[in-house]
Amino acid sequence: MATFTDAEIDELFETSGTVIDNIITAQGKSAETVGRSAIPHGKTKALSAAWEKHGSIQPPASQDTPDRQDRSDKQPSTPEQATPHDSPPATSADQPPTQATDEAVDTQLRTGASNSLLLMLDKLSNKSSNAKKGLWSSPQEGNHQRPTQQQGSQPSRGNSQERPQNQVKAAPGNQGTDANTAYHGQWEESQLSAGATPHALRSRQSQDNTLVSADHVQPPVDFVQAMMSMMEAISQRVSKVDYQLDLVLKQTSSIPMMRSEIQQLKTSVAVMEANLGMMKILDPGCANVSSLSDLRAVARSHPVLVSGPGDPSPYVTQGGEMALNKLSQPVPHPSELIKSATACGPDIGVEKDTVRALIMSRPMHPSSSAKLLSKLDAAGSIEEIRKIKRLALNG
């Protein structure tokens, strides 16, 4: 096993401290993020306090090792010595609790600037590991997102497990300086979880393996069911309205036919009114009456039976009898009450009087009515009188 002298050990301490300071103070390209910072919510204040504490501890560290700074200026660091990237990382499970961290602060004051810097990096890695655990255990979007995050973090763990094996093969003699290399692995892990900081190198991992917080994922839509039920109700109402509209259309399809029938009825009623206006109900006993006033005048003339004392001698026969008619009127000659039995037939005179009254009441031209009256006077049979009557009605 190789042995180192005190001077070589001092050189190793000086070189590792210089490399760590160069890494911290290097102005590299900041890690790129898409949309929002990769720093977990609520960790900004803790990180700022840690950097302020580191700034307050840094000056005494530079005062304790002035000779190491001079040696580092004379001897540049070799690639074999500056191999902190292959150091084994310390996981969150290997970190001491809070009381152990307080004891480490006391030892940091005794061991110098390097151990104080590494202890500060240990605290940052603890906070970043706790932030990762909080993201893995938060039930934001269900079980289907957790396997994706765990699968994305498996390649990074595999890389961190391969690095300690390479480091052991390359530098088996770094038994006394295992704290330097181990804690630098934690600093590299904290860089990957903390995101873009003013003095952090760009993460070597791809963005596909970076853990993403699910805080800003859109929540599930709770009102979709209500919208679906509302749409179903609306569709049912629309179907009912459509059915009722079909019924209305069926009823309205018969409206044109009804209109035509109503028009025909109106025409028929008009014709009937015209015919009734041209026709008159004639009194058979008053055929020559053509107006209501004339009919009333005829109705006033009626026989009157005078009772009381009178001279009945003109009506008394030789046998002392008096003949009375149907109206109980005395008849001077009883033979008038006896009528000869003749053949019953239409009375031509009455028919002529009826047709004459009809011709005179019709609104006809005077020449036409005169011709009909002359024909009526010349008619000698019932058939001729009926023909003249038809001509008068047809106008």
UniProtKB/Swiss-Prot annotation:
Residues 222-285 are annotated as: Multimerization. Residues 89-101, 129-180, 203-212 have a biased composition (Polar residues). Residues 29-104, 129-214 are annotated as: Disordered. The keyword rRNA processing does not apply. Transmembrane segments: none annotated. Residues 65-74 have a biased composition (Basic and acidic residues). Keywords: Phosphoprotein, Viral RNA replication. GO terms for biological process: negative stranded viral RNA transcription. Essential cofactor of the RNA polymerase L that plays a central role in the transcription and replication by forming the polymerase complex with RNA polymerase L and recruiting L to the genomic N-RNA template for RNA synthesis. Also plays a central role in the encapsidation of nascent RNA chains by forming the encapsidation complex with the nucleocapsid protein N (N-P complex). Acts as a chaperone for newly synthesized free N protein, so-called N0, allowing encapsidation of nascent RNA chains during replication. The N-terminus consists of a long intrinsically disordered tail. The central part contains the coiled-coil multimerization domain (PMD). Forms a four-stranded coiled coil structure. The C-terminus constitutes the alpha-helical domain that binds to the nucleocapsid (N-RNA complex). Homotetramer. Interacts (via multimerization domain) with polymerase L; this interaction forms the polymerase L-P complex. Interacts (via N-terminus) with N0 (via Ncore); this interaction allows P to chaperon N0 to avoid N polymerization before encapsidation. Interacts (via C-terminus) with N-RNA template; this interaction positions the polymerase on the template for both transcription and replication. Belongs to the rubulavirus/avulavirus P protein family. This is Phosphoprotein.
